[in-house]
């Protein structure tokens, strides 16, 4: 595959007002993507656009709109809406393209652009490369004549539509009545829809992270800071806590005691329930190389399989589609349930866990520890440039660590696809050895 100039593992992402996350690049994305999808025939073409609550969304959104409208694509604006909702609405509104303006779990200073095809799935690498090629050539060609410019409208009921879709994934014979639920929306895209959906299903809802001001998204709250949710669960004596990230495509849960449950355990809860009901497809789960060894062992012990992919929910989804799986995800909390959605959806995943709680009559504390995690350490090392993983000393440190683990664990060292970080993960049955191995690799990376 050719080298990508703009797109990373999850669309285009960066600090607002710095390349590539500038108004100029956003305009080019609109022009290029609009030309690509409009060129297929002569009918009117439609793009739908959602965003999270970052201040820079007010800069990126109009730049994208200008690009799309100038090449003749009609635009529908959703305003703040979760990423999975934009994917769903792309398909339900029969749009040619869906756009989400978000940097997911990152700090407010970052932003990003994610693109979805008419089927609601993220664009392929090949499609992104075609857009990149168009971004760097003759953008003044193919502009629409004055009467052919795109029309732009806001969709006032986008949030209500998504709430109804989400509620439809919850069993009709069940209600959340009697359950006390803390929901942390990270001051992000789900700040209205998530509490409302839970309330309409009967829960007593304690919302937090629902006062976005443009700069507080993900700030000491949401799925990257579950301690805030856990504290409130204990304070309100809630049955469960649910923490979403800024664009609500991932979640973390905590039980009634405030113990945090990560994406691996959430996948295990849902997968085993599906298997018991005879609804698990392809005999297993798709996860990434970062998922805990304990999840793999649990699947094996239950006669199921765990298939691993590179990090990134797009790669998980690709393998799910290839193999016919209906559940996959990441330890970080992306949980994809393809019976309902084309991408990770934190709110839908939370509802499936709640359904298991109700079906079994067990508290979250009894469900949240489906397997004993193998001791695992993850360290992030920031770097300013170059390719640290190509240095001889780093390669030697990794090889030495693998030799020490001697088949009783795993090492994964990789660059982040969204930040200038090297992520170093090791796991195994001996916690002291795992710690030693990670420390050695971290030192090697920092030294280059």
Curated annotation (Swiss-Prot):
One of its GO terms (biological process) is carbohydrate metabolic process. Binds 1 Mg(2+) ion per subunit. GO terms for molecular function: magnesium ion binding; phosphoglucosamine mutase activity; phosphomannomutase activity. It comes from the Bacteria. The keyword Acetylation does not apply. PANTHER family: PHOSPHOGLUCOMUTASE (ALPHA-D-GLUCOSE-1,6-BISPHOSPHATE-DEPENDENT), PHOSPHOHEXOSE MUTASE. This is Phosphoglucosamine mutase. It comes from Caulobacter sp. (strain K31).
